[in-house]
Amino acid sequence: MRRNQYGQPIGEALPHWQPAGMPGHTPLQGRFCRLEPLNLERWGDALYQAYQTAEDDRDWTYLFWERPQSRADFQRYLQAQASSADRNTMVVIDRANGRAVGTCAFLRIDPANGVAELGTINWSPLMKRSALGSEAIFLMLRHLFDDLGYRRCEWKCDSLNLPSRQAAERLGFRYEGT
């Protein structure tokens, strides 16, 4: 371990570091699912139908938005995600049937430092407790680290959202504090 002039551990120098690329602009192909950048015209109706299969609003509790109550509200929700400067939202497509079944996003993207966050993860009932969710996150991580050369990926969730915290830990993320 490298140390500074005071004997403090400071980690290894990165003299050849180059800024990473921007994630979320290319489709990502897996065995069970495919991720595509959010396209409102192509996926809006299918996503609305997928989220309508939920019995209630509980899946929206920890998101920044309440569950849209109409197709028009849902369109505004998608437009807000698509127009945000600090996120690239991806649509999860089930390869078995070609249906859009959820969304996830690259957030707080910082190519200069090689850091990005995964968040606004919203799986419809059509993909919960299936290989689709794990593979979607794997595809995002592989894209960040292997394709683009990122050094760090963060998973931020509400501290009360136990299912999200458990999923993050299962996928290898470590709690760093609140």
Question: Which residue ranges define each predicted feature?
Answer:
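GNAT-family acyltransferases
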Residues: 1-130, 143
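Glycine-rich acyl-CoA binding loop
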Residues: 133-134
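Conserved GNAT acetyl-CoA-binding A-motif
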Residues: 146-156
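Conserved beta-strand-loop-alpha-helix junction that forms the acyl-donor binding cleft
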Residues: 155-165
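Conserved catalytic-core motifs of GNAT/GCN5-like acyltransferases
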Residues: 174-178
